[in-house]
């Protein structure tokens, strides 16, 4: 399934569009999404260590609510970091 990740703060450097779109497996969690974002950073920014720190320390939210690493993502859901 496809998920749109809206980028805020320091994570805006991950894309010039202020968002990234990733394909993830059904029933993926925020923890899984962190891994996909790290894969994206490795591919596009050669594993930039500062970007990795941002992903590992950032909170995620959906519908203006902070969500935990075990939160299950739904299809076409917008997630923010």
What do the predicted segments below correspond to?
Residues 1-81:
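Ubiquitin-like/PB1-type beta-grasp interaction modules and other compact soluble beta-rich domains
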């Amino acid at each position: 399934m496809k998920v749109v990740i809206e980028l805020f703060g320091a994570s805006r450097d991950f894309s010039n569009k202020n968002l990234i779109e990733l394909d993830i497996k059904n029933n993926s969690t925020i923890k899984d999404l962190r891994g996909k974002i790290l894969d994206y950073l490795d591919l596009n920014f050669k594993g930039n260590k500062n970007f990795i720190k941002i992903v590992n320390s950032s909170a995620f939210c959906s519908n203006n609510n902070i969500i935990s690493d075990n939160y299950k993502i739904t299809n076409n859901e917008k997630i923010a970091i």
